[in-house]
């Protein structure tokens, strides 16, 4: 025999087998194992002679088939010996052959004669000898065999191999061997199903983790370092196989690309067949139960447990094949789910834990294909335990809580549960029940209830349930962040570090699990939209509401469902609802079907008719009929239902009974029998004979067959007739209406069995069948489709369901528990909840969480503060930093907390309080003291301190303000101790919140500022302890955020400015000053930034100064504002742009201030601005210059000193000089100039172009219009000065104005000046091309001018018009109309001024006027006269109601008492108006007369015509006025009563006729051509005759008068005194008439003599008061009449 070094020869197999055979020879008993020894020697000799000869069909590498059989025979013989020393080398040899892949081929039960089959069978068999070492060796060989890629162990052989390992585990006495057996089985599962997944023998394999296998079971068999030993055992086997050389051929080829992977034939399909078979048998093993006789079979329980553990390994490591391959998916549904279902009734905790672990994996990985199953198992495994609050199993419930926490690690899983179940009409509200169940657990058993839990267990449950709720809300937040596609997770960073990473794909790969695969066979993309899900959920909620109502009041419920269109209004549709809807109360269904109303009756008939009883015996039919509802208790209702049932049964089975009455009676009997047989209260049961006897003669008088009745009796007695959902087990008291509503009563009843012992008895088979039917029924519905959503809007519905329970759980736990870990967990939950609700924009929910957290800080009651309250403060700060962009209105609560923290910290440090801002009466010494350091010296009985120590409610703006009494020392000590807790929060953390504001988004910073303003206002208004903390923070955040884009900053500042205004107007002067000074600092910084043209940011920024200046009642504040504005402007003048508007508004308000020092201070700055910085004003928009002018004008209104007013006007002149001297020309550089028509010939081009720019026009407009308004000032000096400055400006600089601009100047500047005396604005509408804005087109008439002012204005106007007549000639008609308006003014001064100005205008320009221009002048004068006449006549009509002297007695004539006050006022007004009217008319006559006299050579006939019309009209009016005797009497009486002088009516008449006569005579004499053209001579004669008649009227009595006095016609009576006076007054006029007649040419006199001769004769008869009349009359007779007679 060769040496041991060469044993086995040269072949590879020989080198492995040889040493083993040699060892067998040495260990064998020579006598007992002679044949074995000889066989070994023979093989050794043979191996020496063999060489490697590859044979593909050979099971042994390098040998032929025959050689392989011979070589392996000794091994088989050794294994059969049962002798351990021989078996060990044989097993070792087998292990090497398998590990080195020297054995190859397919092993299956179909070829039991194959060498490999025999070898494996022999190996399995040796386990029976009971040697522990042999067991380990067998396990090693079997694992190596399965591990070998060259051997495919199939079918029963594979099962036998697994069973062998299974038996080692179950029957072993060594803990290490048991662990190894389990580990080997788990490794085999990994190998088999990894290859099935890959469909190849060459798949990469993972090594099982032994420690994970012991997580649930077998912890008790873990002896010493057994786990380490077993892990090494598995690793050795796996690595030994990896050391094998590369195979020379592949046993199983993977399917070619494009080929089907589900072929029925081929090696690839065999791998999957084996995997499926193994999975199926494991499921069967897990469903083995003890017999009723032997319920304590612990071996069976362990085997079941092991099977479930192996199934867990398979499921945990399963891949996409389980969803993509229908066969594997169905295996899970039909086998694994059935196993879970059957084992669900067991109370063995390890089994329950394994079920939960398997279910968790199914949820994670396969939920998309198992929607219906998940909907059943979740309530069965999880919810029923979770909702059991009073009598839970501690381990069981902890398992469920662990499961829930585990599934929350996958955010998609939580979302999918809600979408596919809570939003599914036919599915239970799993998510809602999870949250509510966790809430119940977190709150613990209700008060007063009994529970089996120990206090420690109860606390554990509470904390774990809170952790689960935190995990849920965290998962929701994680999913939300993922869907929003945010680069960095939106989850708070500090929270991300507290929990494992959310990258589940990576973490799950490490622990051997993966998330649900992308393959979703039932995925419905159309339903993934959140809006659709919202509709479905709303429909479900509404329908559940109807079901709940039905279970209370069936008829109301049906009406509601029909009205809400959840159920159709036909009986058939209602029947479908009753039969197919889960959650309906069976008793209520029966009650409804038995109702006597019409519609329920129709429903009952339709319900019964929906059943098909064909070929059913009566017992089956009634049992089938009653499975859907419970018969009502009322006999009449049962009668109606049974009557219809009998009819339906007979209709389906017409040959069963002779009539329906038989079926009706028999049905009643069966119901009574069922009650009698199965009611425990009935002691004496009905016998079969009794039943038969009771039913005799019911078939139309005949008896039914006894056999028939007997069989029916047996059916009912043996098998109770009951509803399909009824269970033989009683319902738990914990069962609630929600379970019924979701149709889970029947499912949950089976798991409510309470077993005190671990009995391996399975669930009720009937119930299992019912559940399987539910699976099948749901799988065919559209609702079974699995939905995946990506729209984060779905979170809104989830939050609506969960936020209440979460808030309650977190709040109650945080409030009741002082455990630090519990508090931290609750605060994490709050933070996640705030994150989700804030990002989703759910304001109510967000504010609820934030408010609760703020309350839990306990800052409002610091005396009771604990560590958990400080943690809440930290959480509040973290929320502010991390979710600040989404807090919106919730910022108020957070900032309130920060304010209170700072307050408490200041109190603790003894720093001075803010009282110094508010208590102005305190001495400086007291202000400096502040509060003592509380931590060192205790506290004083200070009101503020006592209020803080006492505390208050969270919502109160102040803390304990109205609680009287001193605080006790122990209260103070406790308060100081609690203040030490706040040392954990540094000022940096507080300030960081405010500094972080610059990182907030636009909407967030706006909300932040709003909230801070609100908090600050609350601080300032505190009645006990006002503070400025938030006010200072407002200034800080303004600094922080000032560099934001202008659009955002303007929104921020609009809020801040309103706040600063409200605080600046505060009654507290110190606070107002503080705010204004802070505002000044902000403004100074803001003005450092340059502003581009046409922006308004600076103006908006400075607006608070303006408003406070305008509204503040404090002189100190107003003075401070003026100083602030002055400092800002003078130091930042180059950067001020739009801010000028606010600057001038402030100074404008200051100019009208009641304090002289404020006025002078503001004017001093204005003076400096105008003198030194005028160019900065004009470089901005035109409105800025307008504001400057308005400001200066306001200063002119100052009543403190005339120097300010006059200086302001001088500055207006200065502004004009600056404008005219080119103060704006530099702005036009670079502007392309266009040629324009020069105003005059001597202007430079730059000056010509200067006024063509709209910008430059806009600068002059406010200046000129401002001065124009000043002309109506009540002070004469201001009026005169403004008039002078205005017209000087126009006269000095008018040459640079364009023609268009001049039109605007007249319409908007000059004409409004005269409104106060003219009262008409008609001129302003005549110039449509005005460049002036409409705001300057009207001028307020505030004061009436005196004569001097009127004269000045008119003089200035004429001078200006004369100077620029060439340019403004078009305004002549308006100017003349204006002067005519002055003339007709009621006041004498303007009238005289108008006359003088008009005459001067005509004198200066008369020779330059055209015909039309002259005509315009006279027409204007004519219009003035006519307007005056018409208005005066209206005035005279007011005297009509005053009685004349004819109606009064002599005593009453002058009796003032008989005239009322109104009449006296009317008389006084008429007298005054008459006097002014006469004056105006005389002035008009004078103007016309003077114009003709001076310019008669320039006037044409058309002009003369207008002149004559004017004089004729006025003279006629004067005559009419003087001839109204009644009016004269009334006026005379009024003057007598009022002691006034009478109006000069006679003088008015005489003067007008005198002028009229003079003009006519002058025309006839000096302008015969015009006289002839206009027949002036005829008009002259007419006037002369009229004058003579007027004279004769007062000197002679006319005929009508004689008749009245009844005197003879020829009587001559002497004149009275009045007539003499009138005659004397008219004498000069008569003389003038006689002279005019005398001067007529002879022909003319002769022509008119017949007309006036009688009048001359009458003059002779008249009594004259003047001798001059007779003398001139005699001359007329002598000269004219005599000459005419001589002819």
From Swiss-Prot:
GO terms for cellular component: chloroplast; cytosol; membrane. Residues 532-719 form the SEC7 domain. Residues 514-523 have a biased composition (Basic and acidic residues). This is Brefeldin A-inhibited guanine nucleotide-exchange protein 1. It comes from Arabidopsis thaliana (Mouse-ear cress). Activates the ARF proteins by exchanging bound GDP for free GTP. Plays a role in vesicular protein sorting. GO terms for biological process: protein transport; regulation of ARF protein signal transduction. The active site is at residue 634. The lineage of its organism: Eukaryota, Viridiplantae, Streptophyta, Embryophyta, Tracheophyta.
């Amino acid at each position: 025999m060769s040496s041991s070094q060469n044993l086995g020869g040269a072949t590879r197999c020989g080198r492995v087998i040889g040493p083993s055979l040699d060892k067998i020879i040495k260990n064998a008993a020579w006598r007992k194992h002679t044949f074995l020894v000889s066989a070994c020697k023979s093989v050794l000799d043979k191996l020496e002679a063999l060489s490697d000869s590859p044979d593909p069909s050979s099971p042994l590498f390098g040998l032929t088939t025959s050689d392989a059989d011979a070589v392996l025979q000794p091994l088989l013989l050794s294994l059969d010996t049962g002798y351990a020393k021989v078996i060990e080398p044989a097993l070792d040899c087998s292990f090497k052959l398998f590990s080195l892949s020297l054995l190859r081929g397919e092993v299956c039960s179909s070829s039991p004669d194959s060498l490999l089959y025999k070898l494996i069978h022999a190996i399995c068999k040796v386990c029976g000898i009971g040697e522990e070492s042999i067991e380990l060796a067998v396990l090693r060989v079997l694992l190596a065999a399965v591990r070998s890629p060259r051997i495919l162990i199939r079918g029963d052989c594979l099962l036998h191999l697994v069973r062998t390992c299974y038996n080692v585990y179950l029957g072993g006495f060594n803990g290490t061997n048991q662990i190894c057996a389990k580990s080997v089985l788990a490794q085999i599962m990994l190998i088999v199903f990894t290859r099935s997944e890959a469909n190849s023998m060459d798949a990469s394999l993972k090594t099982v983790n032994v420690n994970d296998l012991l997580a649930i079971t077998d912890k008790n068999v873990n002896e010493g370092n057994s786990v380490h030993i077993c892990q090494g055992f598995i690793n050795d086997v796996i690595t030994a196989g990896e050391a094998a050389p590369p195979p020379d051929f592949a046993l199983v080829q993977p399917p070619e690309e494009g080929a089907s992977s589900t072929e029925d034939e081929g090696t690839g399909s065999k791998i999957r067949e084996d995997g499926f078979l193994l999975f199926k048998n494991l499921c069967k093993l897990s469903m083995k139960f003890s017999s009723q006789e032997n319920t304590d079979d612990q071996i069976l329980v362990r085997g079941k447990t092991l099977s479930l553990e192996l199934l867990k390994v398979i499921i945990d490591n399963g891949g996409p094949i389980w969803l993509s391959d229908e066969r594997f998916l169905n295996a899970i549904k039909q086998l694994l789910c059935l196993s879970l279902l059957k084992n669900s009734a067991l109370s063995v905790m390890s089994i329950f834990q394994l079920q939960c672990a398997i279910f968790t994996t199914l949820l994670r990985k396969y939920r998309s294909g198992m929607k219906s199953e998940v909907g059943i198992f979740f309530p069965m495994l999880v919810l029923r335990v979770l909702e059991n609050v009073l009598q839970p199993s501690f381990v069981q419930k902890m398992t469920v809580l662990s499961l829930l926490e585990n599934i929350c690690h996958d955010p998609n899983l939580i979302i999918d549960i809600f979408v596919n179940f809570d939003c599914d009409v036919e599915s239970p509200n799993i998510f809602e029940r999870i949250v509510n169940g966790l809430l119940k657990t977190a709150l613990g058993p209700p008060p007063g209830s009994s529970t089996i839990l120990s206090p420690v267990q109860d606390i554990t449950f509470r904390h774990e349930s809170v952790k689960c709720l935190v995990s849920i809300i965290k998962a929701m937040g994680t999913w939300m962040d993922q869907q929003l596609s945010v680069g960095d997770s939106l989850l708070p960073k500090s929270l991300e570090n507290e929990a494992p990473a959310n990258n589940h794909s990576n973490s799950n790969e490490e622990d051997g699990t993966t998330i649900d695969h992308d393959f979703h066979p039932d995925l419905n993309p159309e339903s993934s939209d959140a809006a659709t899900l919202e509709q479905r959920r709303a429909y479900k909620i509404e329908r559940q509401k109807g079901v709940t109502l039905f279970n209370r009041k069936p008829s109301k419920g049906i009406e509601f469902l029909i009205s809400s269109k959840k159920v159709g209004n036909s009986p058939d549709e209602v029947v479908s609802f009753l039969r197919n809807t889960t959650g309906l109360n069976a008793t209520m269904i029966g009650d409804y079907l038995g109702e006597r109303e019409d519609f329920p009756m129709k429903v009952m008939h339709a319900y019964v008719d929906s059943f098909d009883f064909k070929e059913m015996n009566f017992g089956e039919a009634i049992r089938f009929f009653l499975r859907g509802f419970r018969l009502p208790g009322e006999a009449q209702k049962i009668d109606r239902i049974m009557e219809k049932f009998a009819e339906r049964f007979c209709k389906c089975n017409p040959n069963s009974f002779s009539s329906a009455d038989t079926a009706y009676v028999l049905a009643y009997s069966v119901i009574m029998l069922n009650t009698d047989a199965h009611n425990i209260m009935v002691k004496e049961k009905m016998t079969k004979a009794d039943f038969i006897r009771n039913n005799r003669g019911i078939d139309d008088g005949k008896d039914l067959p006894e056999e028939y009745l007997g069989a029916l009796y047996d059916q009912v007695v043996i098998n109770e007739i009951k509803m399909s959902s009824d269970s033989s087990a009683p319902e738990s008291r914990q069962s609630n209406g929600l379970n019924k509503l979701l149709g889970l009563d029947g499912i949950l009843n089976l798991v409510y069995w309470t077993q005190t012992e671990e009995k391996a008895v399975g669930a009720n088979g009937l119930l299992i069948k019912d559940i399987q039917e539910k699976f099948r029924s749901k799988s065919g519905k559209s609702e079974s489709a699995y939905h995946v959503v990506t729209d984060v809007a779905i979170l809104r519905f989830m939050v609506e369901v969960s936020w209440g329970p979460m808030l309650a759980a977190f709040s109650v736990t945080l409030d009741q528990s002082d455990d630090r870990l519990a508090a931290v967990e609750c605060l994490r939950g709050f933070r996640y909840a705030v994150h989700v609700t804030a990002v989703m924009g759910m304001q109510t929910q967000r504010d609820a969480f934030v408010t609760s957290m703020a309350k839990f800080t306990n800052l409002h009651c610091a005396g009771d503060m604990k560590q958990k309250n400080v943690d809440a403060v930290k959480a509040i700060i973290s929320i502010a930093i991390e979710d600040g962009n989404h807090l919106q209105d919730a910022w108020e609560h957070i900032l309130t907390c920060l304010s209170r923290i700072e307050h408490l910290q200041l109190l603790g440090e003894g720093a001075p309080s803010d009282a110094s801002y508010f208590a102005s009466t305190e001495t400086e010494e007291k202000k400096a003291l502040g509060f003592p350091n509380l931590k060192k010296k205790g506290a004083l009985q200070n009101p503020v301190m006592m209020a803080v120590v006492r505390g208050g409610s969270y919502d109160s703006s102040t803390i304990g303000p109205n609680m009287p009494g001193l605080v006790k020392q122990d209260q103070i000590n406790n308060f100081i101790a609690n203040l030490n807790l706040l040392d954990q929060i540094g000022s940096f953390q507080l300030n960081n919140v405010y500094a972080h504001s610059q990182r907030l988004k636009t909407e967030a910073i706006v909300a932040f500022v709003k909230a801070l303003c609100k908090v600050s206002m609350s601080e300032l208004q505190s009645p006990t302890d006002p503070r400025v903390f938030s006010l200072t923070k407002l200034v800080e955040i303004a600094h922080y955020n000032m560099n934001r884009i202008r659009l955002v900053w303007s929104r921020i500042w609009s809020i801040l400015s309103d706040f600063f205004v409200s605080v600046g107007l505060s009654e507290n002067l110190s606070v107002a000053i503080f705010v204004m000074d802070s505002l000044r600092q902000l403004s100074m910084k803001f003005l450092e930034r340059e502003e581009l043209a046409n922006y308004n940011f600076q103006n908006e920024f400075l607006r608070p100064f303006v408003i406070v200046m305008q509204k503040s009642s404090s002189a100190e504040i107003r003075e401070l504002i003026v100083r602030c504005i002055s400092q800002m402007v003078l130091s930042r003048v180059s950067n001020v742009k739009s801010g000028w508007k606010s600057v001038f508004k402030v100074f404008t308000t200051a100019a009208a201030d009641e304090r002289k020092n404020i006025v002078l201070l503001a004017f001093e700055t204005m003076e400096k601005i105008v003198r030194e910085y005028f160019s900065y004003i004009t470089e901005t928009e035109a409105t800025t210059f307008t504001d400057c002018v308005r400001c200066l004008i306001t200063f002119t209104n100052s009543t403190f000193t005339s120097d300010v007013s006059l200086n302001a006007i001088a500055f207006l002149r200065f502004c004009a000089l600056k404008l005219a001297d080119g103060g704006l020309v530099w702005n036009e550089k670079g502007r392309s100039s266009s040629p324009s028509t020069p105003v005059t010939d001597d202007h430079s081009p730059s000056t010509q172009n200067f006024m063509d720019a709209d910008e430059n026009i806009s600068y002059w407009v406010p200046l000129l219009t401002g001065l124009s308004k000043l002309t109506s000032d009540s002070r004469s000096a201001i009026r005169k000065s403004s008039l002078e400055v205005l017209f000087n400006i126009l006269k000095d600089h008018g040459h640079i104005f364009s023609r268009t601009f001049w039109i605007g100047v007249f319409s908007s500047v000059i004409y409004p000046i005269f409104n106060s005396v003219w009262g008409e604005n008609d001129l302003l509408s005549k110039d449509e091309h005005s460049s002036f804005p409409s705001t300057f087109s009207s001028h307020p008439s505030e004061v009436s001018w005196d004569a001097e002012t009127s004269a000045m204005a008119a003089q200035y106007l004429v001078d200006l018009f004369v100077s620029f007549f060439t340019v403004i000639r078009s305004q002549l008609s308006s100017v003349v109309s204006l002067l005519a308006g002055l003339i007709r003014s009621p006041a004498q001064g303007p009238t005289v001024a108008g006359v003088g100005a008009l005459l001067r205008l005509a004198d200066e320009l008369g020779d330059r006027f055209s015909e039309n221009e002259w005509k315009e002048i006279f027409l204007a004068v004519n219009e003035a006269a006519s307007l005056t006449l018409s208005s005066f006549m209206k005035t005279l009509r007011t005297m009509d109601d005053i009685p004349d002297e004819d109606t009064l007695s002599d005593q009453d004539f002058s009796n003032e008492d008989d005239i009322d006050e109104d009449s006296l006022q009317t008389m006084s007004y008429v007298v005054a108006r008459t006097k002014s009217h006469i004056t105006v008319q005389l002035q008009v006559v004078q103007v016309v007369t003077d114009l003709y006299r001076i310019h008669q050579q320039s006037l044409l006939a058309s002009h003369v015509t207008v002149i004559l019309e004017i004089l004729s009209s006025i003279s006629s009016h004067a005559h009419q006025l003087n001839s109204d005797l009644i009016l004269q009497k009334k006026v005379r009486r009024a003057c007598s009563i009022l002691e006034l002088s009478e109006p000069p009516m006679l003088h008015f008449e005489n003067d007008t006729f005198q002028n009229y006569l003079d003009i006519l005579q002058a025309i006839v004499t000096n302008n015969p051509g015009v006289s002839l053209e206009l027949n002036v001579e005829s008009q002259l004669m007419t006037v002369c005759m009229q004058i003579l008649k007027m004279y004769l009227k007062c000197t002679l009595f006319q005929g009508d008068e004689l008749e009245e006095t009844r005197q003879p016609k020829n009587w001559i009576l002497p004149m009275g005194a009045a007539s003499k006076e009138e005659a004397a007054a008219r004498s000069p006029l008569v003389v003038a008439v006689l002279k005019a007649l005398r001067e007529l040419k002879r022909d003319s006199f002769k022509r008119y003599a017949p007309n006036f001769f009688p009048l001359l004769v009458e003059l002779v008869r008249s009594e004259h008061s003047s001798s001059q009349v007779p003398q001139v009359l005699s001359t007329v007779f002598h000269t004219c009449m005599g000459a005419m007679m001589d002819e």
